[in-house]
């Protein structure tokens, strides 16, 4: 998609602090990190959100989930990390190109407060 900021980053049209790239996937540091280590893993193929994914994306999604721990370890997250996929406006998605946030380092608070 020509006007998608993540597509532009994956094509090298917008600079980023690259973590990883191959023919299908691209990972880069978040410009507004919420933790000492915070990067995103995206498919080069434009898929707007997890709601748009279908069975044709199974292998791609599997590769993303299997690559995330490898990249997390390479970024120094040996003690654990969090993966977040915000989906749709109601789920907090801000950029409508499927992406996985890999977050860690320091103390990561609980996702949801238990009462």
Name each model feature, range by range.
Residues 1-115:
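HIT superfamily nucleotide-processing domains
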């Amino acid at each position: 998609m020509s006007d998608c900021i993540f597509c532009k980053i994956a094509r090298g049209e917008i600079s980023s602090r690259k973590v990883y790239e191959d023919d299908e996937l691209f990972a880069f540091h978040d410009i507004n990190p919420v933790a000492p280590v915070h990067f995103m893993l995206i498919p080069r193929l434009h898929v707007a959100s997890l709601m748009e994914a279908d069975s044709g994306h199974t292998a791609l999604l599997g590769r993303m989930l299997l690559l995330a721990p490898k990249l997390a370890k390479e970024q120094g997250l040996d003690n654990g990390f969090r993966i977040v996929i915000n989906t749709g406006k109601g789920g907090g998605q801000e950029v409508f190109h499927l992406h996985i946030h890999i977050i860690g380092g320091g103390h990561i608070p609980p996702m949801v407060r238990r009462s």
